[in-house]
A protein has these predicted regions:
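Proteins with a high burden of low-complexity, intrinsically disordered sequence enriched in S/T/G/P/A and R
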Residues: 3-4, 21-23
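Short hotspots in intrinsically disordered terminal tails
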Residues: 1-2, 152
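Catalytic glycan-binding domains that act on GlcNAc-containing polysaccharides
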Residues: 23-155
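Sec-dependent signal peptide recognition
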Residues: 2-12
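N-terminal signal peptide c-region/cleavage motif recognized by signal peptidases
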Residues: 17-19
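Exposed boundary/loop context
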Residues: 13-15, 59
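N-terminal leader/targeting segments
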Residues: 12-13, 22
């Protein structure tokens, strides 16, 4: 738990040193999808520690790219919008917007709640083990989200 908190604090300190341009991606995506930009930041922190060049390779055909860790299972769907794995990796704002798109789908399907945030990572399967993963992920993102909000609170 201490390691998690240390990681959160370290990345939060780093996160607030980003240029205005980087923050604009979260702010714009949040505005356009009606999602708190800080929630998007919390998801990005949980997914990649805010690393826009993150790659999580499970196998040649199963991998996730970028700050929001967009999974390869979504690439066929995204291709109809002209979004490619390369654009998700090289265009930070495209990656953040795509993450916001999938989070918005979860909110539309299940409402704005932490289990919906968990669906971003663990999907919508009704199997008990998937529900447990959703709840765990939602709780982790909630913790990060609250840390972000506490950092912004007036002192």
């Amino acid at each position: 738990m201490e390691l998690i908190m240390l990681r959160i604090v370290t990345v939060l300190c780093f996160m607030f040193t980003f240029t205005a341009n980087a923050s604009d991606c979260f702010d714009a995506a949040g505005r356009d999808y009606h999602i708190d930009p800080d929630l998007l930041r919390a998801v990005a922190f949980r997914e990649s520690s805010m690393n826009s060049h993150a790659m999580n390779i499970v196998s040649p055909d199963k991998y996730a790219v970028g700050e929001m860790q967009i999974h390869s299972q979504n690439f066929a769907h995204l291709s109809q919008f002209g979004i490619t794995p390369q654009s998700l990796f090289s265009d930070r704002c495209m990656n953040v917007y795509t993450g916001a798109y999938y989070l918005a789908i979860a909110f539309k399907r299940w409402g704005v709640k932490w289990e919906s945030v968990g669906a971003y990572n663990a999907g919508f399967s009704q199997k008990p083990e998937q529900k447990e993963k959703r709840l765990k992920y939602g709780k982790e993102v909630h913790q990060i989200y609250m840390e972000i909000k506490n950092q912004k609170a007036p002192q």
